């Protein structure tokens, strides 16, 4: 159990710090604001040592919100200096803080410190990702932005066909520039794809997991990389159920008393990019993967809605991928068919007995 809790509200240029001493305080206390840089971090730790009343740094717990890349310098610096860091969802901290009126960086740091103290039993220690995984995430994020720019440029080019009031020479000039921009972006995307493959090949663990994923027919390279990145190479999100929940393909019921009893549905609190990629993988697998195609056709023949069947396929793809990673093996169509047949036979026997 930790004794000294530090809440850090991180922004682009500064970090606001509050602390809570479990033995001597009844509520968290604000410390100061520091620059979001190694110099500021050194000053922060120096001031905290003066406030901790001799509590060893081994008994310290730093907690901050996941703010994208802004909190990475702080977390990496603290871990390099032997500190324990807990990165928590900003939404989780907000919902656990009760009714709030107004906010600022100082108040947020106080709330984060109190959250760390009250919920220390739920603490998940931050572990620095490997250099290869960090490079893969940066390259994949850059590729996604290039694709978004290309899509926007293509839409702009398409809209030129209905543009009115332009002279032919101006229209041709704009179309030419947009076409060149699309070609440039396509070349950059191809270059990033090559870089991503080089990063994967340079790390044996990444390469092994990547090969297991793409062995599932219907799951392409981009979906495989996205799953590796968002799961921390299957170390941050460690189970298929957690991944299904994170991607927004796990269904939840809403029931209360006799007035509320909604059927199970998926939540909008999800990573929609991964969900979109899984949707494309499910559609591809329903046509090209014999195991999933058989399930797709069989379930549709029972009158199930198409959207429900595709969502079930997304879940099955996640479950299969996690099993492949766990067992360190590739996808085997014959084994999956035999396993599915045996499972259906058991279900039929149970229904008959009932």
Positions of PLM-derived features:
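A detector of single, family-specific signature residues
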Residues: 1-354
